[in-house]
């Protein structure tokens, strides 16, 4: 699910689809989901790389850096990877934009989570809090900038970063801020939902459910079953 299911969920939001209705009924038997999966499959079959059904973050990053991927929708944190001239052959040719929409009022923007968590059962709570405070501090950001460059500082830790003249020179800085400010996890889809989350439903059961559903979608992309069959199994 974390490889292909995350993207398709973001896309589905812009098509008006949702994982569950307000009564927690699965919604894969809807026209919105059929439109989402068919659009993605048709687009990738026509213009995507061979074996796209099994590609994830690392495969897509590698292709983009080699100039073999013309459009990649993923996390804003990946922007520094594709603009680093030491790793990317297209570093000086990359542009950035908000993810597209279908005219229904919601973009297919990527949003996983900006969060650092501490396990409830930890014996090192104070140390964990101290680490998080340091890892999100201005001192840490300046340390990264000094050693790795401003393009590589954590983009989601501090609002004040976007007021820094040096960071404002980074080509994707403003687009990253726009993306963060446009995120709305409580209203990620066209229709109301009982869950919070843009690319997932924030419930304990979701990872297992989403893995099963994503495997059915991947089988459809690979031609092992039809889109209709995949959606029927997801609905079940």
Residue spans of the language-model regions?
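Extracytoplasmic/periplasmic solute-binding protein
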Residues: 1-26, 32-33, 69
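C-terminal lobe and pocket-closing loops
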Residues: 77-91, 102-212
